A protein has these predicted regions:
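Membrane-embedded, hydrophobic transmembrane alpha-helices
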Residues: 1-89
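Transmembrane alpha-helical segments
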Residues: 110, 280-285, 406-413, 439-440, ...
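Active-site lumenal/periplasmic loops and adjacent helix-entry segments of GT-C-fold
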Residues: 93, 97-98, 104-245
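Extracytoplasmic
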Residues: 131, 459-532, 660-661
């Protein structure tokens, strides 16, 4: 309702200055952009994002009230007020089709309730953590770091200030309106964004594609049911879904009309929506800019002769305005672009089949069949023959050519099966393909029973989407949400999260209300050594050390009081693939190479274990045999239980021994625990450590 309030106010404010195409999705999109941009800018400039949300809602309410008063003065009666509401909401019969498409694609997921689900990625908990930072006010970052004194906290604090600000703003709005934590809002956010996308694309093709309405509408929905773009939805990629939806709203604005004497109104609307789309997922939108530009040219070309159609000057002004609105985030966007420039982010995915263009690819992993490419060649040939008999601008060729050129560029840089290419294809399938398919079906509308054939394709696509939604492998159980507010858990001042599941760990760290929370397992952030004596675990799953007390919380989780694994004096631990149990001593970002070598990498790396009683209060030497890799000129530093200690190493790089000498006062600072941190002497530098063996001895041993 909040997006409808703001979006309706935007339509009322634009009024006669810009005739925006009707559609409930377009209204919601205007609302999303009108919230995301100012709220994000306020946060970026050091203001209170929650106050900005309230301010936007108040302005929207005032706009509704003032417009309503004007309507009542001009036209009396309930009928006039009803027309006024309908004009602001702008719903159409096509929105019913959009709702049906959304339900077909999401009902199996909605059945899980207000929880977190995903296929492979773990991004959504980061959005939820960003909402926690934003909701805490201008000093919320410091409070968040105090509550999360670990790698998870550092990573999420960085992300809240740098990554996808517009998506965070939308989720913050939803959290404030519903009173629910951001981590529980995946399902409603997904439904709204997917409806926004489908409804808006239906509104656009209804204007730019000729022919009978329902065959054109069905043709529009076929690509939107493809498992390739829906795979991004099922992967809980909120930013990608929002970016695609708002790019569709940009097309809707270009399909509208306005007085030529006031291009700044339309340009301002384009600027706000385009800036919001970029802020939802900067690398996706910028990386797809050639295809998006082609789609915009197509819509503009199809509408250029309509009365009051927007001219190129308006579009250019809108793009310039979007750049200006993005200036507060420009450094962050560039940083994200540099970080993802090598294309190594994400995981490899098979290149989609052409069947995905009409929703007929059954799964994301389908192997491409030769017949699919044959159909593509025949379609292109048919288009060329049509244009030879019907001369005119080749707008469809511009859109398709731009999308193909964009694809070729990304494949050249990243490879055919890269994650970057796959998410681009997902965007192109929902932004470019519906335009072309709707145009083709519109031109063929005289063909007998064409609507029936298109309906069959859509039904098959809906079936594929339904099956894919039922196969999402990761669903956070309701038992986790039940722990929020559980006094047995929240009375523990410092809680370690060690639930064995990297998807559940960041959710638990976000929704639980303990004074301090430490994530002791690797997520997108490095793991951190345990702090304190209590941990949340999966029932009967534990690998860090002896248990002193076990409290059953529910069927899935336990609260345990624990100690760390003890390393005896003189015991030589071998950290090879044959002894995985020894890896429980290592924290940070450790991975085993293809040769079986165990490497720790990042800005720091940790070891944590328990000392035997005879070594507590004595000076000890920790010896690591392996290899050190530092940047030229950097030196290795070490801390033990938070205290700087002496360390010797084989220069800045090379094989040999790393010896950490821990004084007696450090070994008694934390009971029998010894937590050692290795890091470079230069801030921001990175360290690589390969460990073969570990040994602890007293100073006289």
């Amino acid at each position: 309702m909040a997006l409808l309030l703001v979006g309706g106010a935007a339509r009322l404010a634009l009024g006669a200055r810009l005739d925006v195409v009707p559609g409930l999705g377009v209204t919601l999109g205007l609302g999303a952009a009108a919230v995301a941009v100012p709220v994000s800018i306020v946060f970026a400039l050091g203001g209170d994002a929650t106050h900005a949300v309230v301010g936007v809602l108040v302005v929207a309410a005032v706009a509704w009230l003032s417009s309503g008063l004007v309507t009542v003065r001009r036209e009396r009666g309930a009928a006039a007020l009803w027309r006024w509401v309908r004009r602001a909401v702008a719903a159409t019969p096509l929105d019913a089709l959009a709702a049906a498409v959304v339900l077909a694609a999401t009902v199996p997921l909605l059945w899980h309730g207000l929880t977190y689900w995903t296929t492979f990625s773990n991004d959504f908990p980061s959005y939820a953590a960003s909402v926690e930072v934003w909701a805490a006010g201008p000093q919320g970052g410091a409070a968040f770091l105090e509550r999360h004194p670990d790698g998870f906290g550092e990573y999420q604090h960085w992300r809240a200030h740098t990554a996808k600000p517009m998506a965070t703003a939308l989720l913050l709005l939803a959290s404030m309106v519903t009173g629910l934590p951001g981590a529980q809002l995946l399902a409603p956010a997904t439904v709204v964004l997917l409806f926004l996308l489908v409804s808006t694309m239906l509104a656009v093709t209804a204007v730019v594609a000729p022919g009978r309405r329902w065959p054109v509408a069905l043709a529009t929905t076929a690509p939107l049911l493809s498992v390739v773009p829906l795979g991004r939805v099922y992967d809980a990629q909120l930013g990608q879904a929002a970016a695609a939806a708002l790019l569709a709203v940009v097309l809707a604005l270009l399909a509208g009309s306005g007085p030529p004497a006031r291009p700044w109104v339309a340009a301002s609307a384009v600027a706000v929506v385009l800036a919001a789309a970029v802020g939802m997922n900067p690398t996706l939108v910028v990386g797809s800019s050639v295809a998006v530009a082609g789609a915009c040219v197509y819509v503009w070309g199809r509408r250029r002769r309509a009365s009051g159609a927007l001219d190129l000057r308006t579009v250019v002004l809108g793009v310039i305005g979007a750049v200006v609105l993005s200036l507060p985030f420009l450094g962050d966007y560039l940083g994200l672009g540099v970080a993802e420039a090598d294309g190594t982010g994400g995981y490899e995915l098979p290149f989609p089949s052409p069947a995905a263009l009409v929703g007929l690819q059954r799964t994301v992993d389908d192997v491409i069949s030769p017949w699919a490419w044959t159909v593509v060649v025949l379609v292109v040939a048919g288009y060329v023959l049509y244009k030879r008999k019907h001369p005119g601008p080749w707008w469809a060729a511009v859109a398709a050519g731009a999308a193909a050129a964009n694809l070729a560029l990304l494949v050249h840089v990243y490879g055919l099966q890269s994650y970057s290419v796959h998410k681009y294809v997902a965007l192109a399938v929902v932004v470019v393909v519906p335009l072309l398919l709707a145009r083709a079906v519109g031109l063929l509308s005289a063909v007998t029973r064409l609507a029936d054939a298109v309906a069959v394709v859509v039904a098959l696509g809906a079936a594929n989407a339904w099956v894919a939604a039922t196969q999402v492998p990761v669903v956070v159980p309701d038992d986790l949400w039940a722990l929020a507010g559980d006094r047995r858990v929240e009375q523990v001042p410092v809680l370690n999260v060690h639930v064995s599941n990297a998807y559940e760990a960041p959710v638990a760290a976000t929704v639980l209300g303990n004074e301090r929370i430490v994530v002791t397992q690797l997520t997108y952030a490095p793991s951190h050594p345990p702090v304190g004596d209590w941990a949340l675990i999966h029932r009967d799953w534990w690998d860090l050390g002896p248990l002193d007390e076990v409290i059953d919380l529910n069927e899935t989780y336990q609260l345990v009081r624990f100690g760390l694994t003890e390393v005896s004096e003189g015991e030589r631990l071998v950290l090879d693939a044959a002894h995985p149990e020894h890896e429980r001593l290592l924290y940070g970002r450790w991975n085993r190479s293809t040769r079986g070598e165990l490497w720790g990498a990042g800005e720091q790396t940790w070891l944590a274990f328990a000392l035997p009683d005879q070594l507590v209060g004595r000076e000890v030497r920790l010896t690591l045999e392996g290899e050190l890799d530092l940047e030229d000129g950097d030196r290795l530093r070490a801390e033990a239980n938070g205290q700087p200690v002496d360390v010797t190493a084989p220069g800045s790089s090379g094989e040999g021994r790393i010896v950490v000498t821990v004084p007696a006062d450090a070994t008694r600072r934390d009971g029998d625990r010894l937590t050692v941190r290795l890091f470079p002497d230069r801030d921001g530098a990175r360290i690589g450590v390969r460990v073969e063996t570990l040994e602890v001895r007293g100073s006289s041993g």
